[in-house]
Amino acid sequence: MFEYVTGYVEYVGPEYVVIDHNGIGYQIFTPNPYVFQRSKQEIRVYTYHYVREDIMALYGFKTREERLLFTKLLGVSGIGPKGALAILASGQTGQVVQAIEHEDEKFLVKFPGVGKKTARQMILDLKGKLADVVPDAFVDLFSDTERFDEKKGSSAELDEALEALRALGYAEREVSRVVPELLKESLTTDQYIKKALSLLLNGKR
């Protein structure tokens, strides 16, 4: 129904943002609302209008590719909007695609609500069908196994750090806030934890 919404970020919450467009506030659920910052500059959010008997909601994404992966995930049995958002909340779109293409169940089951059965279903339903989702930086992932193994290693260290944060009592929304910053660097598990704690304690988003 809506391709995108352009406007000003009026509110940022744990689950959604409100975009003000011509005096109308659009409540848009996003994978990580904290990647959007309140400002006087207009932004564009690519949207997906989800309608079912018991729910009608707008879901928003920073790129068309992210939205496309969301819609493909919705087509997998056992994954609903909340589950799809949780998968995308890490900001690791390319690595999710890599995991599916290389049948890496261990990576996929680390997402909230994804068990072994759902991970296998994701691979069965989506493997070989995600080339149009992959950003330019990952155009050769389907043939470059060595690069995948290297990225999977650093991803494992980040995953361990995120699990440690959860074990320390940080809520999922707090963990999601710092993921974009952590993804900018390649660190050891301990270094990821120290940096994440610094970001959380300083309130940086």
Curated annotation (Swiss-Prot):
Residues 153-205 are annotated as: Domain III. Residues 142-152 are annotated as: Flexible linker. It comes from Bacillus cereus (strain ATCC 14579 / DSM 31 / CCUG 7414 / JCM 2152 / NBRC 15305 / NCIMB 9373 / NCTC 2599 / NRRL B-3711). It comes from the Bacteria. Homotetramer. Forms an RuvA(8)-RuvB(12)-Holliday junction (HJ) complex. HJ DNA is sandwiched between 2 RuvA tetramers; dsDNA enters through RuvA and exits via RuvB. An RuvB hexamer assembles on each DNA strand where it exits the tetramer. Each RuvB hexamer is contacted by two RuvA subunits (via domain III) on 2 adjacent RuvB subunits; this complex drives branch migration. In the full resolvosome a probable DNA-RuvA(4)-RuvB(12)-RuvC(2) complex forms which resolves the HJ. Residues 63-141 are annotated as: Domain II. Gene3D superfamilies: 5' to 3' exonuclease, C-terminal subdomain, DNA helicase RuvA subunit, C-terminal domain, Nucleic acid-binding proteins. Has three domains with a flexible linker between the domains II and III and assumes an 'L' shape. Domain III is highly mobile and contacts RuvB. This is Holliday junction branch migration complex subunit RuvA. The RuvA-RuvB-RuvC complex processes Holliday junction (HJ) DNA during genetic recombination and DNA repair, while the RuvA-RuvB complex plays an important role in the rescue of blocked DNA replication forks via replication fork reversal (RFR). RuvA specifically binds to HJ cruciform DNA, conferring on it an open structure. The RuvB hexamer acts as an ATP-dependent pump, pulling dsDNA into and through the RuvAB complex. HJ branch migration allows RuvC to scan DNA until it finds its consensus sequence, where it cleaves and resolves the cruciform DNA. GO terms for cellular component: cytoplasm; Holliday junction helicase complex; Holliday junction resolvase complex. Residues 1-62 are annotated as: Domain I. One of its GO terms (biological process) is DNA repair. It is found in: Cytoplasm. InterPro entries: DNA_helicase_Holl-junc_RuvA_I, Hlx-hairpin-Hlx_DNA-bd_motif, NA-bd_OB-fold, RuvA, RuvA_2-like, RuvA_C, RuvA_C_sf. GO terms for molecular function: ATP binding; four-way junction DNA binding; four-way junction helicase activity. Belongs to the RuvA family. It holds the Pfam family HHH_5. Keywords: Cytoplasm, DNA damage, DNA recombination, DNA repair, DNA-binding.
